[in-house]
């Protein structure tokens, strides 16, 4: 099993969560005292039918098919932000497998800016579309904030500005409710993380004092409702629910169910594929995890869209652990070395997967009586890790033990 449960978490993930509080689809619903004249294209069944297969194609990484459908939608509704936002969502999922790749940033931001421009026109000039315009304004600003806060971008000024804009539209619609299950998504994330963040990071309480009080239990309930009943936000809600249940709520069985569903429903999505492999591995279900991981590596070898070194690093490490547990050191070494190779390809040689692969290689070399090779691996870990890292401490102890034996 993985040693050190926190070693694989990006320290910038928290920043993404904070932006997410006021970001993704963060518009709450509307309560009306008179006959409702609000128009919601999101609720239009004809449009939903038109988008259904395209959304499936999007999440299954059939981007060209999805783009063709969304372009057709844009021809019909070029005055509405929906098609531009969906085109931007395609670019977002091109980024998701490897956030170190910035080649899609420009196009993604262009679509989000178009969404904002068109939604702002509706917001300012067409009262019947004001609620839906707020939805897209908050969503677009939120996604921009998430991108800017990513580890590879770290543009905190733009991230903060986008987060503030998203918050403004959240505040605009705070008193409104019961319009659409789509619009519960932002409220769900806010309710959950506005409580979770200060509970787990007390130092951030001062930053969050201006936020309304959330409710974690309600947030989870709302997130489940969106994952069951929404159309456009359903899959995004399931992704967040899976991650929350797995990482924060100690409900791995339920997270596993969602992960398996997402992988089986969208088998060509590399993010869902590797997350499924990750949960299988962490649950110790090695018999099932082995072919899943091997399939990831096969897809990388065949250059399948979205399958690259990030997914390979996961799969190779898990296979190394599986074969080491089965006392097959040669196979274990093969995949640990492959994990390190993948990590080097994406400049992630200081990541937990790479460091613990090196430690495992050193331990195997030590068991085989090759002290020189073992020392080489442990020294490499010390060189690439911080002094406070568990990997550094482990490598230091191993080296000390080896030196005593000389």
Regions found by a protein language model. Name each.
Residues 60, 94, 144, 194, ...:
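Structural motif corresponding to the intra-repeat A-B loop/turn of tetratricopeptide repeats
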Residues 41-42, 75, 125, 175, ...:
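Structural signature of alpha-solenoid helical repeat scaffolds
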Residues 33, 38, 43-49, 57-67, ...:
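Short coil/linker segments at helix-helix boundaries
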């Amino acid at each position: 099993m993985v040693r050190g449960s926190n070693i694989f978490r990006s320290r910038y993930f928290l920043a993404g969560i904070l932006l997410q509080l006021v970001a993704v689809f963060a518009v709450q619903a509307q309560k009306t005292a008179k006959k409702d004249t609000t128009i919601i294209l999101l609720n239009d069944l004809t449009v939903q039918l038109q988008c259904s297969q395209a959304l499936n194609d999007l999440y299954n990484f059939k981007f060209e098919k999805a783009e063709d459908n969304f372009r057709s939608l844009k021809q019909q509704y070029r005055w509405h932000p929906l098609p531009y936002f969906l085109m931007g969502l395609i670019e977002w999922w091109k980024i998701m497998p490897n956030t170190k790749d910035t080649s899609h940033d420009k196009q993604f931001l262009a679509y989000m800016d178009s969404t904002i421009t068109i939604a702002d026109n509706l917001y300012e000039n067409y009262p019947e579309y004001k609620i839906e315009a707020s939805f897209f304004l908050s969503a677009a600003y939120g996604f921009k904030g998430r991108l800017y806060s990513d580890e590879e971008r770290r543009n905190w000024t733009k991230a903060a500005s986008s987060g503030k804009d998203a918050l403004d539209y959240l505040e605009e619609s705070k008193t409104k409710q019961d319009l659409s299950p789509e619009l519960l998504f932002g409220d769900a994330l806010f309710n959950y993380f506005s409580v979770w963040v200060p509970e787990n990071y007390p130092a951030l309480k001062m930053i969050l004092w201006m936020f309304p009080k959330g409710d974690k239990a309600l947030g989870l309930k709302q997130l489940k409702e969106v994952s069951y009943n929404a159309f456009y936000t359903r899959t995004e809600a399931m992704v967040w629910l899976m991650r929350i249940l797995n990482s924060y709520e100690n409900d791995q069985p339920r997270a596993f169910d969602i992960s398996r569903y997402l992988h089986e429903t969208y088998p060509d999505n590399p993010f869902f594929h590797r997350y499924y492999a990750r949960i299988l591995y962490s649950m110790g279900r090695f018999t099932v995890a082995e072919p899943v991981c091997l399939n990831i590596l096969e897809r990388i070898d065949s250059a399948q869209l979205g399958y690259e070194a990030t997914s390979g690093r996961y799969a190779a490490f898990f296979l190394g652990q599986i074969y080491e547990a089965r006392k097959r050191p040669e196979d274990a070494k093969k995949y640990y070395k492959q994990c390190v190779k993948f990590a080097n390809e994406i400049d992630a040689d200081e990541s937990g997967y790479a460091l613990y692969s090196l430690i495992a290689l050193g331990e195997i070399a030590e068991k085989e009586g090759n002290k020189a090779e073992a020392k080489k691996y442990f020294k490499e870990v010390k060189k690439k890790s911080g002094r406070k890292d568990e990997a550094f401490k482990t490598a230091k102890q191993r080296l000390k033990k080896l030196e005593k034996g000389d």
